[in-house]
Amino acid sequence: MINLDIARRRMVENQIVARGIKDRRVIDAMLKVPRHIFVEEAMSAQAYSDSSLPIGEKQTISQPYMVALMSGMLQLTGKEKVLELGTGSGYQAAILAELADRVYTVERIRPLALRARKALDSLGYLNVNLKIGDGTDGWASEAPFDAILVTAGAPDVPMHLIDQLAVGGKLVIPVGNQSEQTLVRITKGENGAVSREDSIGCRFVKLIGRYGWSGED
C-alpha cells in the first residue's frame, strides 16, 4: 500500500522544487492539498505521478508541475480575489484557495462541477465559489478580479477577460492551436494598457465555449 503523504512530499521535492519552483507559498500549498482526493479512488496510487490524469468527460487533472508553475505566475500574496476558468477536478481551485483570499471557479460540465464541489467541501474550502456555465464568459458580475487562471487551451486571449481584471491584475492562459499551446501571462496596467509575457510550451485540453473552441472542432 502506497503512503500517499510520502508520495505527496516526493512529488513536491522531485517534480516541483527540483524544476525550479521557488515560491514558498506555492510549495506549501502543493504539500498540503491532497491531490488523490481529486481523482477516482482507483487512481489514488497514480495521484502524485508526474503526469496529467483522466477525470472523466474527456477532461484531465493537470500535471502537478504545471499547476505549481501557473499558480506561481499569478504572484498571489493571500489577499486576492481570483477567477479560475475550468474547474475540472477542483484540485487547482484548492491550490488557489490556499494562495488567495477568495476563489471563483466556473465549470461547464455538470458532473465534474458536482464532484469538484464535493471534494472541495470535504477539505473545508469555504472560500471557493463554484458555478456551472460557460467559463469563457468569465464571471462579470463578480469582477474585477486580481488574477484570472484559465486551465484549458484557448485559440487566443479573450479580451473581455482582460476587462474583468483589476488594474495590476494578471491573467494566465494557455494560447495556441488544439494540440499545442504557449503559457501566456497578461498584466493589466493603468488606462487598460496590457503587457504580455510568453512562457513555456504546454498541452491542455481545449477551452470550449463561446470565446474558445467549439465542441465539434
UniProtKB/Swiss-Prot annotation:
Cellular component aspect of the GO annotation: cytoplasm
Presence of the UniProt keyword Oxidoreductase in the record: no
Biological processes annotated in GO: methylation; protein modification process; protein repair
Active site, per annotation: 62
Gene3D superfamilies, per database record: Vaccinia Virus protein VP39
Domain of life: Bacteria
The keyword Ligase appears for this protein: no
Catalytic activities: [protein]-L-isoaspartate + S-adenosyl-L-methionine = [protein]-L-isoaspartate alpha-methyl ester + S-adenosyl-L-homocysteine
Database matches in PANTHER family: PROTEIN-L-ISOASPARTATE O-METHYLTRANSFERASE, PROTEIN-L-ISOASPARTATE(D-ASPARTATE) O-METHYLTRANSFERASE
HAMAP family linked to this entry: PIMT
Name the UniProt record assigns to this protein: Protein-L-isoaspartate O-methyltransferase 2
Organism of origin: Geotalea uraniireducens (strain Rf4) (Geobacter uraniireducens)
Higher taxonomy: Bacteria, Pseudomonadati, Thermodesulfobacteriota, Desulfuromonadia, Geobacterales
